[in-house]
Amino acid sequence: MAEKLMKYSEAVKEFDPVIGLETHVELSTRTKLFCPAPISFGAEPNTELTPVSLGLPGSLPVLNATAVDYAIKLGLALHCQINEWSQFSRKNYFYPDMPRDYQISQYDKPTNGEGYLDVELEDGSVFRVPIERAHIEDDAGKNTHVGGADGRIEGADHSLVDYNRAGVPLIEIVTKPITGVGDRGPEIAGAYMRAIRDIVRALNISHARMEQGNMRADVNVSLRRSPDDPFGTRSETKNVNSFRGIERTVQYEIRRQAAILNDGGEILQETRHWDEASQATAGGRVKSDADDYRYFPDPDLVMLHITPEHIERLKAEMPEMPRERRNRLKAEWKFSDVEMRDVINADALDLIEETVKLGASPAGAKKWWLGELSREANAKGISLEELPINAQEVADVEKLIAEGKLNDKLAKQTVALVLKGEGTPAEIVEKHGFKVVSDDGMLQTAVDEAMAANPDVVEKLRSGNMKPMGAIIGAVMRATKGQADAKAVTKIVMEKIKG
């Protein structure tokens, strides 16, 4: 039975939403957090294991120093307080995906303390998200429930467990309650998650592919009548693995909770799950006020000491952060705020930057990646990076246009053939005999014929109405099989109507 929902615009007028996000980022180290087991996506189940990752008696953990450095770099990017001393604790719980029956995490002494992240919204404004902590922990294995209708344990015939993921290093970034969001809660949550993805990719510490589980989020939502009231009871939607899913989870929970509260009901403190098919959250486990995981310091791991000198060395290795990079490129490329937001929303910044480095103009690179190629990617349901064309090939097409060897129509045909796998732009131009007709005599003849066939258009042009010019250019293009230079044709037409 569908849950009752309040209209979103009414819900955010009646209530003050409060959001919290717990983001799990899988680090791209070669080996696991506490053992030398390799890490690779898509490996055969239960093949990347050691006694430590299986929690076998007598096995002892050894901390991965690279994972610690990655965590510190992320802490620096999030303006966190880097704690000189931090500690690993055992988080005790029993579930089939946790072979040793406890997770090694950081409890009261995390590596990264309080910080913040400024995120840009669609209108160009900036919203500051407060960070509570960003701590290191190891991941659990992965359960696959077989026989159920939706892949969940309810109704499943049996379950399979793959421990390859057990022990993979994670950073969990926990926000403080995000207040003051008004009606922009979904947008702020999505912008924050995209900013986290961009940062960890810039730092080269995670692939951050949500579809592969490299990055996922638990989304907490609560409502209160007024910003002066105490926080309401929150729901926690677990393991949401897409940006759109996060945005829709926030919106759905605001609408669901508002309807309950408006009818005089109470919100259950529970874990929920986002169902992509129904575009709704579904109820799960009802939680007590606080889960008792019986944390205690892991006796097999000494406290982690991070010296100021080590922090300074890592600071010196920090790359340019995504927001600063976007602002720099926007100025260099002379893009407007709207143009730059279009580039970012299309996830085309890296591709355009690489294309420009290879010789294309910023405007030309943007034209291709946000035009023909974006339409092609959207039609196929894939990302721009997955298209069978690269920055070098786009830059080569732009070069051929600049050299007068291709016009817009021939360039589009060339790109279409590159996408079909027929070769490089140069090979395609040679193979198909593409060339721009620049012979003045041929163009003069084609223009004369087009003007003779369109006397009404010529009359309008002579009276100063330039809108019908396209009819003459189109006729010349047809006569030359699309190989005429449109600028040259326009010049000839203008000379003839003035003469």
Swiss-Prot record:
GO annotation, biological process: glutaminyl-tRNAGln biosynthesis via transamidation; translation
SUPFAM superfamilies named in the record: GatB/YqeY motif, Glutamine synthetase/guanido kinase
InterPro entries named in the record: Asn/Gln-tRNA_amidoTrfase_suB/E, Asn/Gln-tRNA_Trfase_suB/E_cat, Asn/Gln_amidotransferase, Asn/Gln_tRNA_amidoTrase-B-like, GatB, GatB_Yqey_C_2, Gln-tRNA_amidoTrfase_suB_CS, Gln_synth/guanido_kin_cat_dom
Family according to the record: Belongs to the GatB/GatE family. GatB subfamily.
Organism (species): Bifidobacterium animalis subsp. lactis (strain AD011)
Entry superkingdom: Bacteria
Reactions performed catalytically: L-glutamyl-tRNA(Gln) + L-glutamine + ATP + H2O = L-glutaminyl-tRNA(Gln) + L-glutamate + ADP + phosphate + H(+); L-aspartyl-tRNA(Asn) + L-glutamine + ATP + H2O = L-asparaginyl-tRNA(Asn) + L-glutamate + ADP + phosphate + 2 H(+)
Role this protein plays: Allows the formation of correctly charged Asn-tRNA(Asn) or Gln-tRNA(Gln) through the transamidation of misacylated Asp-tRNA(Asn) or Glu-tRNA(Gln) in organisms which lack either or both of asparaginyl-tRNA or glutaminyl-tRNA synthetases. The reaction takes place in the presence of glutamine and ATP through an activated phospho-Asp-tRNA(Asn) or phospho-Glu-tRNA(Gln).
E.C. numbers: 6.3.5.-
Gene3D superfamilies: 1.10.10.410
Signal peptide coordinates: none
Keywords noted in UniProt: ATP-binding, Ligase, Nucleotide-binding, Protein biosynthesis
Gene name for this UniProt entry: gatB
GO molecular function: asparaginyl-tRNA synthase (glutamine-hydrolyzing) activity; ATP binding; glutaminyl-tRNA synthase (glutamine-hydrolyzing) activity
Subunit (UniProt): Heterotrimer of A, B and C subunits.
Pfam families for this protein: GatB_N (PF02934), GatB_Yqey (PF02637)
UniProt-recorded name of the protein: Aspartyl/glutamyl-tRNA(Asn/Gln) amidotransferase subunit B
